A protein has these predicted regions:
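N-terminal glycine-rich phosphate-binding loop and ensuing alpha1 helix
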Residues: 2, 7-70
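Active-site nucleotide-sugar/metal-binding loop of Leloir-type enzymes
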Residues: 97-112
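Structural beta-sheet core signal
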Residues: 18-20, 63, 115, 140-143
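Acidic helix N-cap motif at the loop->helix transition within catalytic regions
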Residues: 71-76
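Conserved donor nucleotide-binding strand/loop of the catalytic core
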Residues: 80-93
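Conserved core of the sugar-phosphate nucleotidyltransferase
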Residues: 122-214, 243
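SAM-dependent methyltransferases
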Residues: 1-19, 23, 54, 199-201, ...
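Residue-level signal for inorganic ion chemistry
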Residues: 20, 45, 102, 116-117, ...
């Protein structure tokens, strides 16, 4: 009976394409390509893609990458069995542009688009499925975790101008999932108006759409510095020790 309910639920869920942002410059890694760094003998990007491959809610994967990495990433997808990857496309001049280019290549069947940082290799299929399920209900959803440190606003010279209430702050993660037409319109608007956005939720918020947050995962960190890679290795080792 439980299996039957699962099949019915699967049949009714919307088609979801994951858009993987993998065209960054890795400037904070000292020129090293973060996505091709090995994490327990597997490239960071491949760990991210494997989680999307295993997530029941993801039907298709489109990757936006640097032009010089297109062939390598396509080859790695075949090597690691990323069968959901339909296309690897050239990224744009900014993250926003890259995600839009990937979105335009998504299947016409896609009702939801899930934007995933390529450099979040510890994201889990469980979290991915939870965010997609939330977005299917409300149209725009993302994972986030409470901010632990005290945050200060400062001037360009470093003078403190304020201390936001930490209880109202959240650190955003990915995947960030949206109705397909909504995300494409939001990204197009941000680009046309030359408005810098640091995540896809920001672009959607500009259009007046409410984005709902669900509990994220503290282990779902983004690899942007060598220290992040060291922490990720420790988390992965602990995960493997638990299994």
């Amino acid at each position: 009976m439980r299996s039957l309910f699962r099949k019915i639920r699967e049949a009714n869920r919307p088609f979801c394409t994951a858009l993987v942002a993998a065209a960054g410059s890795s400037s904070r890694m000292g020129g090293v390509d973060t996505l091709m760094e090995f994490l327990d003998n597997v490239p960071v990007l491949m760990r991210t893609l494997t989680a999307l491959q295993r997530a029941a809610a993801i039907d298709e994967i489109v990757i936006a990458a640097r032009e010089d990495a297109l062939v390598d990433i396509s080859t790695l997808c075949k090597t690691y069995g990323i069968t959901k990857c339909s296309k690897v496309v050239r990224g744009g001049e900014s993250r926003c542009h890259s995600v839009l280019l990937a979105a335009l290549e998504a299947s016409p069947e896609a009702k939801l688009l899930a934007v995933q940082d390529g450099a979040r290799p510890l994201v889990t299929p469980v979290l991915i499925d939870r965010v997609v399920e939330a977005a299917a209900r409300c149209g725009a959803a993302a994972p986030a975790i409470p901010v632990k440190d005290t945050i200060k606003t400062v001037t360009a010279e470093g003078a403190v101008t304020g201390t936001p209430d930490r209880s109202t702050l959240r650190a955003m993660q990915t995947p960030q999932v949206f109705e397909a037409d909504l995300l494409k319109a939001a990204l197009q608007s941000a680009l046309e108006n030359e408005i810098p956005v640091t995540d896809d939720c920001s672009a959607v918020e500009r259009l007046g759409k409410v984005v709902y947050l669900i509990d994220g995962d503290e282990e779902n960190l983004k690899i942007t510095t060598p220290m992040d890679l060291t922490v990720a290795e420790a988390i992965l080792a602990e995960r493997e020790a638990r299994t």
